[in-house]
A protein has these predicted regions:
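Catalytic core of pol beta-like nucleotidyltransferases
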Residues: 1-3, 7, 19-26, 36-201
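Short, glycine- and small/hydrophobic-rich beta-strand elements in well-ordered beta-sheets
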Residues: 7-15
Length: 201
């Protein structure tokens, strides 16, 4: 990326299981690249640079211009900030550190998205893969909810699990896999519905 963009790269980081030290063989390589600006030709240059990298098939992540990142939804920036391990640069030089209000927004908007997708999937798609993806997404909502209650962000699933009880703990356990479609859909739906009511803005 340095050869493709020179001094335009304001930040490079890594997210996901590799950032948390929980990666398995074949886990995605979630890279964050923030440039001073990002136009469509820059996307093409990113793609060309990525083609030469080893394990290209695992590469994914987030690419943005600095102004777009600063204008991003604060609730989404909460998880983005806390889930990103810096490799080059500091996110704090680009965005303010997200706080408790941003965490509340993350819980509410995340729960709304899960609620809608879960009900749609149960009624129409009946897709176990989509349910698994929603359960994985719930982990970000759970981290934000835990932050609201403790003031601490727990990246590790094991550390997070130690602090959760009740429906929160049940959803996290379902996100680890092997859940029955009907039962897991019910638990996830009821959990998301409760959070929407609790965190209504």
């Amino acid at each position: 990326m340095r050869s493709a963009f020179g001094g335009r790269g304001g930040f490079i980081g890594i997210q996901g299981s590799r950032a948390r030290g929980e990666a398995a063989e074949g886990s995605d390589i979630d890279v964050v690249l923030i440039l001073d600006r990002l136009d469509f030709d820059d996307l093409r240059r990113c793609r060309e640079a990525a083609e030469a990298l080893p394990h290209r098939e695992l590469l994914c992540g987030f690419v943005s211009g600095a102004d777009e990142l600063r204008g991003w939804d604060r609730g989404e920036l909460f998880g983005f900030y806390h889930d990103t391990r810096p490799v080059l640069g500091r996110l704090e030089e680009l965005i303010p550190v997200p706080g408790a209000g941003d965490a509340r927004r993350a819980v509410h908007s995340g729960a709304c998205g899960i609620y809608h997708a879960c009900s749609h999937n149960y009624l129409h798609e009946r897709d176990a893969g989509l349910l698994a993806a929603l359960l994985k997404t719930s982990r970000f909502v759970l981290r934000a909810r835990c932050f609201c209650e403790t003031g601490r962000y727990f990246s590790s699933l094991d550390e997070l699990a130690e602090r959760l009880t009740g429906a929160d703990r049940a959803v996290l356990e379902l996100s680890r896999g092997g859940a029955d479609f009907e039962a897991a859909s019910r638990v996830l739906y009821d959990w998301a519905r409760g959070l929407i009511e609790e965190y209504a803005i």
